[in-house]
Amino acid sequence: MLTHLDSQGRANMVDVTEKAVTAREAIAEARVRMLPDTLRMIVDGQHPKGDVFAVARIAGIQAAKKTSDLIPLCHPLMLTGVKVELAAEGEDVVHIVARCKLAGQTGVEMEALTAASVTALTIYDMCKAVDKGMVIEQVRLLEKTGGKSGHYKVEA
């Protein structure tokens, strides 16, 4: 059942008034594939626009906080924690992991996915002048805890 549709099939924001407040957490990932020279430039701190990982991390955190402004039926949430980690993976990939937490009545999957996505988009934006062929890939939810639907973890 699609919870964002009413009995006439119209979109609406789900009423969570009666849902219990529980601890909730979601972890999402994304990858940005690029030329080895581009990744080397980032890791060596030689990018002309500055510290790509630092800027992308802040963008991801800000995006998590702004998710309800971007996704129409998402509830505005009072996140209690957002963490974005970036790491070079091999010679041509940046791996992004975004983690969002709160004690609330609805999950934080969309916030974690938005954080990972905007982090990847920021890397693309900062590096497109030197590498137009970058690919953002594998944006997905890795794990979520809390709430009525319980625990979910992607299978390896």
From Swiss-Prot:
Substrate binds at residues 73-75, 110-111. The active site is at residue 125. The keyword Glycoprotein does not apply. It catalyses: (8S)-3',8-cyclo-7,8-dihydroguanosine 5'-triphosphate = cyclic pyranopterin phosphate + diphosphate. Pathway: Cofactor biosynthesis; molybdopterin biosynthesis. Its EC number is 4.6.1.17. Keywords: Lyase, Molybdenum cofactor biosynthesis. GO terms for molecular function: cyclic pyranopterin monophosphate synthase activity. GO terms for biological process: Mo-molybdopterin cofactor biosynthetic process. Catalyzes the conversion of (8S)-3',8-cyclo-7,8-dihydroguanosine 5'-triphosphate to cyclic pyranopterin monophosphate (cPMP). Belongs to the MoaC family. HAMAP family: MoaC_B (MF_01224_B). Homohexamer; trimer of dimers. This is Cyclic pyranopterin monophosphate synthase.
